[in-house]
Amino acid sequence: MADFLYRALERGLSALKKREYRLDRSIPLSLLVGTVLRRFAWLVRGAVKCLVLQRRIGFVFMAPNVNLRNASLIRFGKGVTLERGVIIDGLSRDGIEFGENVMIGPYSVIRAGMLSNLGAGVRMGANCSLDAYSYIGAAGPVTIGDNVIMGQHIAFHAENHDYERVDIPIKHQGTRRKGIVIEDDCWVGSNTTFLDGAHVGRGCVIAAGSLVRGEFPPYSIVVGAPARVLRSRLTTEALHSQAVATGGHPG
């Protein structure tokens, strides 16, 4: 019986995530059932939220105390999970969009501007995760590719204040907004901050505690505050593996 339940759950999760998914058999069955029931309650809560908002936002898991503001400007792919206490404010020019199977961790906040100075918005690709207590300020456009994993306490600040004049307060001098881009398949360590204008290439690893601004080439290992390239991931072995995976030939 237990093996049947494990296999049934694996089939369902594999279909949802569109890849093979295997459960750790060391998880006690009672805990696994409890997790499934909790996720089902989150799914029901998401469906009820859709009805209240009179929106069809798909197959979304919502933990308690999720706050969706200006929800008509928020778009969800299938299988998105919003953990406890998440706040998302869709007020923006381009809206806030999540791909399939995105996870937003507990007490994270995503917003894009204010009534007097509308921000651009956020586009987060499929299979991304943003862990607990993170913040995305998308006054400028924030674009995150597919399969990006991010730790706790991640911050995006896609805006800079002008401060050249000293005769008026900084808050009244205006802002500049270049935006922030993280390409596909990146891993971002905890307590990393992205400043306006940051562009991180595909396959980069960002060390915990980094302060990221400027451009970084694909497959870089990036460390420090301010961040710098420590080395490239493109070793001879990695290039060979990539060539085999794509059916090519190593150079």
Each model region followed by its residue ranges:
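Short, structural beta-strand-to-alpha-helix junction motif
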Residues: 28, 168-169
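Domain-scale signature associated with acetyltransferase and cell-envelope carbohydrate enzymes
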Residues: 1-157, 183-184, 192, 202, ...
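Short acidic/His/Gly/Ser-rich catalytic and metal-binding motifs that mark active-site loops
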Residues: 158-166
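A short acidic, glycine-rich active-site loop
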Residues: 169-180
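C-terminal/domain-terminus segments
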Residues: 199-223, 227
